[in-house]
Amino acid sequence: PAIKRVFYPGLASHPQHGLASTQMKNFSGMMTFQTHEAGMAIARRMVKQLEIIHYAVSLGHLRSLIYWIGTDDIEQSTFRHGPEAASRFRDYMGDGVFRLSVGIEDGDDLWADLVRCF
């Protein structure tokens, strides 16, 4: 499979699923995932091949949006770790993650759009 790891509190396998269940009625339309293949290569394909999902940085839109962010960018903009913690973070995160904000389009159409890029 192309997907290595999914971060979504609506999944029973998510480490904070229990907490999310008490805080969210229907979880959310935001999820993050990693791929086995280099994320930047997939992101470049997405820019050319996506027909329904828009490759853009934003939140809270009716349209579905996806964006890839590299681990270097995540570390520079969000986290401040000591060297040992930074090393563990990089091992866990790989080269980066995709953030998908699901809009109101049909789920089967969105799935087909994503599959085309992998």
Residue ranges and their predicted role:
Residues 1-71, 84-92:
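Conserved small-domain helix->loop->beta segment predominantly found in fold-type I
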Residues 37, 64-118:
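PLP-dependent enzyme catalytic core of the Aspartate aminotransferase-like
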